[in-house]
Amino acid sequence: KCPIIFFCRNNGYAISTPTTEQYGGDGIGGKGIGYGIHVIRVDGNDLIAVYNATKAAREITEQNEPVLIEAMTYRLGHHSTSDDSSAYRCSEEVNTWYQKNNPIVRFRIILENKGWWNNEEDITYQKKIRKEIMEAFLHAEKIPKPNILSMFDDVYKEMPKILQEQRDELREHLNKYGKYYPMKNFEDS
């Protein structure tokens, strides 16, 4: 057995198909049990519960045992840029989840109830963080992207022949057609 934590964010959908139409049962946790893996199911929108579940999973891995954490949550956004989730779920459903089960909102309520946070602090902090994020974006845009061929590095201890061939084909392709790509945005090879 292996001391590993598998963390599944069960958001209720696989692209546009609800999990209720994908498999019997109410989640994938049972599959872990079938493979002899410890399973912890947790409310994925409860920050403290997720922390405690992860802590418990870590303790299990110290016994050289694998663990599957299934965090039950909801996907608020689209699956990808090619997905329009309004085609298979209504805005009321999404808004209800956002307003009632949003993990950030839920944790904020806990902090406010303890007197550790308030609306004024929240507004000030959001402005500060937004500024820091924009500064980080501007800084990152000035840094060249890693060398395109570096995507083949540090994947395997010894690179398989097929991967070496793919890397060589990409290198050859870029030598021939590199002028058609924004190679100036990448570090030199």
Segments (PLM) and residue ranges:
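Intrinsic disorder at enzyme termini
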Residues: 148, 152-189
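Glycine-rich ThDP/TPP pyrophosphate-binding loop and its adjacent helix/strand module
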Residues: 2-142
